[in-house]
């Protein structure tokens, strides 16, 4: 339930997760679960809405923040590659429509935190 509360707070602006008093072990479990499900950046957004005394240890926050930075860099790389690909197709007279991951990420409070895998696009032409 804690993972879902944090995830919900991460994708809904204004929501504050109703959790508190979690042990270090429980926070590590949440980190592992969020990472394995590909939602660690979204859960991080929920954690940042918690009062400082309810957040995980400094050590885990630093580890989590580093992971989120890595996700943000990857997102930036994906956006640049998608733009390069669309430009190459446009040069050949083919219009490109980006689908799913990158396109849907624009609907999230922090688009860079929406997990994206591969690039799905539709070629018109």
Could you say what each language-model-derived stretch is?
Residues 1-11:
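Charged, compositionally biased N-terminal leader segments and the immediate start
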Residues 12-100:
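Helical scaffold of the NTase/Pol beta-like nucleotidyltransferase catalytic core
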Residues 81-125:
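Active-site nucleotide-donor binding segment shared across nucleotidyl transfer reactions
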């Amino acid at each position: 339930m804690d993972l879902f509360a944090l995830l919900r707070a991460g994708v809904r602006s204004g929501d504050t997760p109703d959790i508190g008093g979690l042990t270090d072990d429980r926070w590590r479990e949440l980190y592992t679960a969020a990472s394995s499900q590909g939602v660690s950046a979204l859960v991080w957004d929920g954690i940042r809405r918690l009062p400082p005394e309810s957040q995980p240890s400094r050590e885990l926050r630093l580890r989590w923040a580093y992971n989120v930075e890595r996700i943000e860099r990857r997102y930036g790389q994906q956006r640049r590659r998608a733009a390069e690909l669309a430009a190459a197709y446009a040069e050949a007279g083919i219009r490109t429509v980006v689908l799913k991951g990158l396109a849907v990420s624009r609907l999230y409070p922090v688009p860079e935190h929406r997990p994206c895998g591969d690039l799905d696009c539709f070629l018109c032409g």
